[in-house]
Amino acid sequence: LPLSNMISLPDEEREVFYRDWRILAQDYLLIGKINQEPGSQLVQVQYEFFDVNREIKLAGEVLTGSVTQLRDIGHTISNVVFEQVTRVPGAFTSQLLYIVSEEAGPGLSLFKLEKSDYDGARPQVLLESGEPIMSPSWSPNGQDVAYVSFETGLPRIYIQNIASGQRRQITNYPNTNSSPVWSPDGNKLAMV
């Protein structure tokens, strides 16, 4: 809804007039404000989410973090709003693992294992190799990733810690070592 069409601009519950939003054919209303003390890197984000037709507040809280965490705070709020409307948990704080293949010269490729936000923002390279990388799989605790690398000339499965970058080869079978998948408790890997 364009700002110019809004009848009122509430930033807290006592300023919400449901009739204004019904006139504008809006089913839901999300309002909020960000407070930051001068000279501080901390912000407080206060939001409230309303069902206009039922005239009730569905959710609201104050989230605190650094200025650099505003995107994450926004995604957290998006998860709450999405779940309130759909009854399905939001995925806005999810991260992706994927492989990027780039041309590195005539007949050469560079393969990168990357992670990013669910929308591709904030990509981070976890591994670069001149040999193919495939089948990345998150550990259930989100701290490690298993993947297949051909850096030895043969497919081998590695586990790498996301934070430290430490990695270790865990397979050396003579044939195929592929498609690692973590057990729900994160203590075992299934593979082909």
Please provide the spans of the model-predicted regions.
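Residue-level detector of Asp-centered blade-edge/turn motifs that repeat once per structural unit
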Residues: 88-92, 140-141, 184-185
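Hydrophobic beta-strand positions that form the internal "hydrophobic ladder"
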Residues: 96, 142-146, 186-190
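C-terminal/domain-edge helix-coil "capping" segments
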Residues: 53-125
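Short, solvent-exposed, polar/charged sequence segments at loop or secondary-structure edges
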Residues: 1-43
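A flexible loop/linker signature enriched in serine peptidases of the S9 family
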Residues: 89, 101-112, 128-131, 148-157, ...
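Multi-bladed beta-propeller domains
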Residues: 2-9, 117-134, 160-178
